Amino acid sequence: ITKDALNEYLTIEDKGFYPDYDRFLLYLLLYGCVFRKVYYDSITKKPISRFIIPEDFLVDNNCSSILESNRLTHIRYLSKREILLNMQDGTFRSVALDYLKSTNNIVDTEENDLKEDDVNSGIDISAYSTLSRFKFYETHEYLDLNEFFDSGDTWELDSNSLPSPYVITRCGLSNKIVSIIPNWQEDDPTRTRINCFVHYNLFPGFDI
């Protein structure tokens, strides 16, 4: 029932599904191998199924399928509005990103770009004024978050020390992490990764 309802929504109510599907078929013919992402969009509050350009999807080397890859990275391009909406609804944490400043503030910074903090950071904020979308890396990987905390010299193997699947999103320009989300069912004792990517192969090849 859930699959039928999702299929009906995507093919009837989602106006962007078929234009996106046309691009998907074109890239499949050109590349022979493409990916699609099915997920819940926190901004529209609706399920979304969208094609991913091959250059924007990264997997581990020497894996035969995406299900066997320990790390999957989707390069996303978000507008200023999408970033702020994600921060407002709690999807992203509120972090200081220079390009979220107003255009006037960016111009003022350009005129006074000799400020010590800007020079030391090595970031040219004036370049942001020409960008309409900003790169974010959404990485699906297994992590042991206990490794980020100092537990002393003692270490014992338990269920909490095993790497678990998380979705980590970081800003491509500032390298700041904006989101870390658990990616398994709450009642799943094995903590199996929830996969939202679909791999399509037109021609068999030596690599994924």
Predicted regions and their residues:
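Extended alpha-helical, oligomerization-prone segments that build pores/tubes and scaffolds
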Residues: I1-I208
